[in-house]
């Protein structure tokens, strides 16, 4: 007598997914998923971030009877001090580094993929990831400032050191400049869709240079700031709506704009 049975194909655990499959030979669809995840994640905890930097910067006053820390801690009421382990610090910190993780995964995936993309598209895609990564690290820096930030976080089991303020800015500028070199003169489209300004590498370069100009100002490198601005989307005679945006919607499963409040809302 003999017995036969169906073969069982191995299935990845959906509750504990691994990045190894994506980083070793990602499909175009998987590359797109990484981009969607990064751009969706860029919107997380923006309310905490902008409440923090805006209230401390005296750009607005946050009326919220549910949490006195928004005026107490952030405005230094009485003897109040900023808390290094509360929502206005840890939430945006974690959210930004999650996107950095996505960007690092995308870079590795693009380096190793055997999908039908050109070398120019591969370079442009990596430049996109580096630009997004620099944007997120700059937001972390804006809240940490003199504390400095970690730049090297590619290996979660062996994190790089916290850099000084100047070292952090220099590292972010270098990241943007590396991306710029791979975008400049690269007349291709990314091998994925993006909501960030343009899918064309030469157009996306303008976003990269806008960020580079901002970092250059922080570094007091006025010459680089002016040069970068001239290569960005800035146009003194252009439309005030030209630029790069976060996208929100009321569709199921998507996010509403967390810093929009209807007029006269209590």
Report each predicted region and the residues it spans.
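Short coil/linker segments at helix-helix boundaries
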Residues: 143-174, 190-198
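Membrane-proximal, proline-rich intrinsically disordered regions
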Residues: 6-57
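Conserved, well-structured interaction surfaces
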Residues: 32, 70-144, 159-164, 176-177, ...
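Alpha-helical solenoid repeat scaffolds, predominantly canonical TPR units
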Residues: 102, 168, 175, 182, ...
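Aromatic- and glycine-enriched pocket-lining scaffold segments that form the walls
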Residues: 194-239
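Hydrophobic-face positions in mid-chain alpha helices that act as interaction patches
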Residues: 220-266
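Short coil/turn linking the two alpha-helices of tandem helical-hairpin repeats
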Residues: 139-149, 187, 218-221
């Amino acid at each position: 007598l003999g017995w036969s049975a169906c073969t069982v194909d191995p299935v990845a655990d959906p509750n504990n997914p691994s990045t190894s499959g994506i980083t070793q030979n990602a499909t175009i669809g998987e590359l797109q998923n990484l981009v969607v995840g990064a751009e969706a994640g860029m919107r997380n905890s923006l309310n905490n971030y902008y409440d923090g930097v805006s209230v401390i910067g005296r750009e607005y006053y946050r009326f919220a009877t549910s949490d006195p820390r928004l005026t107490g801690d952030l405005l230094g009421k009485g003897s109040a001090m900023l808390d290094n382990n509360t929502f206005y610090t840890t939430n945006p910190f974690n959210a930004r580094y999650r996107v950095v993780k996505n960007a690092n995964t995308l870079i590795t995936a693009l380096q190793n993929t055997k999908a039908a993309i050109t070398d120019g598209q591969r370079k442009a895609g990596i430049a996109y990831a580096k630009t997004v990564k620099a944007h997120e690290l700059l937001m972390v820096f804006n809240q940490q400032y003199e504390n400095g930030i970690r730049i090297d976080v590619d290996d979660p089991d062996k994190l790089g050191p916290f850099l000084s303020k100047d070292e952090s800015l220099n590292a972010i500028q270098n990241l943007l400049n590396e991306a710029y070199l791979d975008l400049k003169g690269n007349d291709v489209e990314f091998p994925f869709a993006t909501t960030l300004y343009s899918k064309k590498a030469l157009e996306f370069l303008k976003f990269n240079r806008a960020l580079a100009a901002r970092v250059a100002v922080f570094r007091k490198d006025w010459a680089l700031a002016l040069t970068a601005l001239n290569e960005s989307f800035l146009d003194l005679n252009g439309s005030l709506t030209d630029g790069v945006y976060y996208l929100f919607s009321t569709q199921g499963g998507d996010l509403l704009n967390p810093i929009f409040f209807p007029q006269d809302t209590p």
